[in-house]
């Protein structure tokens, strides 16, 4: 997917990027590739692949939601996918990027400073240590972090009631959703939408799962991460 194909795909979904935003995305790409030479950020560094498998993939779910004047937390953001891409493309969205590795946080802050973004913050923390952020967000995202039954317990407590958790998954998404049925019940989550999309170039399937928090969660969740991992809900 060339840059021009990326812009056109966004426009087809009513996302019209300014020249400044286009330049910010390209600078992000350049910083990603340059930093990746000395730090393991991604296995994808070719320009067309970054635009499709990182940038476009990060935006797919956003075409289904109103993001203006909302808050979003991206858990286990890594090199900033999807959260930093969303912050660039939706300047009225307030984004919090959660990442446990300090060196990745340093990279994210470098990009944010370089692009002069004012709607995004980096939180250097494990996702299960975010009690101060409980019930703070309209949306939460996670991409390629863990299986869904584990993610639900970590992420659901961060949502406001009626907030939405979007799990960005590949072709195994529906299998993970079945596996997470008990977790959804215990955490007051319901399936709002399942978005199935194929990437334009290599036809890779993406399954984005939208889970709505219907009411407050029992204060005992999330449990200690070792418990979550050892015995998922």
Q: Which residues make up each language-model segment?
A:
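Class I SAM-dependent transferase core
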Residues: 1-69, 73, 103-120
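Conserved beta-strand signature within the Rossmann-like core of class I S-adenosyl-L-methionine
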Residues: 162-175
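Short alpha-helix immediately C-terminal to the canonical SAM-binding loop
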Residues: 104-106, 173, 177
């Amino acid at each position: 997917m060339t840059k021009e194909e990326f812009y056109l795909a966004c426009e087809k979904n009513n996302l019209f990027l300014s020249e400044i935003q286009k330049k910010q995305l390209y600078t992000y790409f350049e910083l990603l590739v340059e930093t990746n030479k000395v730090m393991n950020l991604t296995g994808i560094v070719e320009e067309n692949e970054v635009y499709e498998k990182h940038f476009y993939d990060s935006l797919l779910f956003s075409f289904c939601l109103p993001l203006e004047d909302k808050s979003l937390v991206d858990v286990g953001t890594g090199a900033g996918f999807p959260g930093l891409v969303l912050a660039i493309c939706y300047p009225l969205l307030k984004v919090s990027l959660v990442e446990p590795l300090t060196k990745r946080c340093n990279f994210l802050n470098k990009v944010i400073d370089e692009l002069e973004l004012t709607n995004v913050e980096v939180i250097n923390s494990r996702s299960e240590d975010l009690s101060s952020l409980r019930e703070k967000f309209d949306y939460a995202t996670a991409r390629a972090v863990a299986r869904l039954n584990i993610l639900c317990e970590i992420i659901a407590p961060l949502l406001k009631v009626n907030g939405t958790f979007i799990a960005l998954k590949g072709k195994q998404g529906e299998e993970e959703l079945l596996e997470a049925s008990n977790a959804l019940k215990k955490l007051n989550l319901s399936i709002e939408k399942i978005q199935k999309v194929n990437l334009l170039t290599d036809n890779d399937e993406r399954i984005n799962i939208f889970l709505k928090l219907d009411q407050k969660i029992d204060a005992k969740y999330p449990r200690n991460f070792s418990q979550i991992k050892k015995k998922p809900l």
